[in-house]
């Protein structure tokens, strides 16, 4: 709050704008600070494929879109929803609601990550070759793509190739073997031993200062090949239409 005394402005209360909320005290934890938007580099520019031009895209967060099984209604309809809540939505639930999505005039379904992970958001992926069991199986994904295609809709999946989860095999190897790990150059490790206490800045680069999502070194040819293979695998295996 502020007041005007003569021609002078006096400030009675001061608050600080953080990443998640407002704070009364100066923010010292970088994880809570507001991040400025990053500029797009020229080498990251790409051409939009013809089929995607002028299309209406509908984003789905699978864990909270629709559940095919009986769920806890009290949990499903509660408010507010926390970032860690898992409401047990799944791929079958999406399939069962494709007619509704089609009637909305949607051309492209974009799903946030569906691969194996311990979180509800699935951005800390453990295994890029396994659908998280809570969502279903590869067969369910294949059926979802087929049913979407029957309705003239495309399926785009989330390419989480910037970082992995800590339980991803390469990072686990580093945690176990330290500087002797053959995957050392897959990440940006600053020093050993690795540390990532909650609320503290890890001693390795990661997404949003969050230690559970160590950042990949995409300049490493082995990393590039691994994730190129992942992208090609799901296109061939399930006929998905693209990656975001």
Predicted regions and their residues:
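Single conserved hydrophobic/aromatic residue that forms the stacking wall/gate
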Residues: 1-6, 10-13
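Substrate-binding/active-site clefts of carbohydrate-active enzymes
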Residues: 55-57, 61-107, 114-238
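Hydrophobic residues within beta-strands of alpha/beta enzymes
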Residues: 109, 241-243
């Amino acid at each position: 709050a502020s007041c005007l005394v003569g021609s002078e402005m006096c400030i009675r209360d001061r608050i600080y704008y953080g990443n998640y909320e407002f704070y009364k005290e100066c923010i010292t934890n970088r994880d809570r600070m507001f991040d400025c938007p990053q500029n797009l580099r020229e080498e990251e520019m790409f051409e939009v494929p013809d089929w995607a031009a002028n299309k209406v895209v509908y984003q789905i967060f699978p864990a909270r879109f629709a559940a095919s099984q009986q769920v806890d209604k009290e949990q499903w309809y509660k408010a507010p929803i926390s970032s860690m809540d898992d409401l047990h939505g799944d791929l079958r639930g999406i399939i069962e609601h494709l007619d509704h999505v089609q009637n909305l005039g949607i051309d492209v379904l974009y799903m946030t990550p569906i691969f194996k992970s311990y979180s509800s958001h699935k951005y800390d992926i453990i295994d890029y070759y396994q659908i998280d069991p809570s969502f279903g199986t590869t067969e369910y994904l294949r059926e979802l793509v087929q049913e979407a295609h029957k309705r003239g809709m495309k399926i785009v999946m989330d390419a989480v190739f910037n970082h992995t989860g800590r339980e991803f095999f390469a990072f686990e190897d580093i945690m176990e073997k330290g500087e002797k790990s053959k995957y050392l150059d897959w990440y940006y490790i600053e020093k050993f031993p690795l540390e990532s206490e909650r609320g503290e800045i890890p001693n390795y680069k990661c997404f949003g200062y969050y230690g559970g999502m160590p950042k990949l070194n995409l300049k490493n040819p082995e990393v590039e090949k691994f994730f190129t293979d992942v992208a090609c695998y799901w296109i061939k295996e399930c006929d998905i239409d693209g990656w975001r």
